[in-house]
Amino acid sequence: ERRSVKIARGGQQLCQQNAAAEGVSHRVRFQKGDAAHLAFPDETFEAAVSNFVFHEVRTQPDKREVVREALRVVKKGGCFAFQDLFEKESLYGDMTDFLSQLRQAGVQELHYIPHVERQGFIPRYVQAPWMLSDVGLLYGRK
């Protein structure tokens, strides 16, 4: 089973339609929630993925806490991949310091790619400086 926690209003019907179109609706569940306070016990999931969500979470001003909350629900040995505006110091502070904190908290394998927009992963035609800048990719195994 796959679960998706959606923080934005609307869109749930579209998610369900896409799942049906891909033939996976019997394996996925979508629910409204708050990424700052996930309604799941510790170590519930084998994997967690987030793409440009954390900086949008209004219920937690400290975006590092949103990352920690996402990691809380990942099982020991589980994988994660988070892409967000990690290079924006006003949101995440110093990433070297944050990565150290995550390692000290027990994250076993931790990788970070700063400025993803400069790595050639994002097609140039969708790169708008006001939209796709300061992007970092944080991934690994808990």
Q: Which residues does each PLM region occupy?
A:
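Class I SAM-dependent methyltransferase SAM/SAH-binding core
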Residues: E1-H37
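Short "lid" loop at the C-terminus of a central beta-strand within the Rossmann-like core
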Residues: R2-V5, F54, L85-E89
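Helix-to-beta-strand junctions that scaffold the AdoMet/dcAdoMet cofactor pocket
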Residues: V24, V57-R58, V74-K76
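A short acidic, Gly/Pro-enriched loop at the edge of an enzyme's catalytic core
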Residues: A36-A48
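A short SAM/SAH-binding and catalytic strip from SAM-dependent methyltransferases
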Residues: E46-P61
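A short glycine-rich, Lys/Arg-flanked "PGG" loop and its adjoining helix->strand segment in the class I
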Residues: K63-K76
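Conserved class I S-adenosyl-L-methionine
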Residues: A81-Q101
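Core SAM-dependent methyltransferase catalytic element
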Residues: A105-G106, Q119-K142
